[in-house]
């Protein structure tokens, strides 16, 4: 973990390399292949509400969870990278947009464990819709961005976070 209380520089660099640099190179490679082959279309990237807002330590009170500064840095970078890509690749009729996803109930990355009950209570109290999102609430936005219905949308963030980022 890389928190403001405790950071391991090697872990920090590894996270940036895996979760930011690979993201950039893969997305750029795809866009370059589309450009080279004269393929127009839509690239849909994924980010997190923590790319828009800082993590709130109050959500983690009385849990074994803590903020992760590296995560926020990476996610805010991916949001801006989407805008940079959209600006450059637009002239090739390649649209680049981002889904900015908030808390989704039921999973902890890389684990079969359920989310901490105290964290869920804290999160649900804060978010305007008073609940976490459901995984089935994401695909319709992907379908929209991939379709011709969004043909004049590029460089945008569709925020799916129950209103968390507005407060």
Model segments located where?
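A glycine/serine/threonine-rich, flexible loop-to-helix segment
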Residues: 56-61, 91, 98-127
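Short C-terminal tail/terminal secondary-structure segment
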Residues: 142-143, 154-167
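A conserved structural motif in NAD(P)-dependent oxidoreductases
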Residues: 127-138, 149
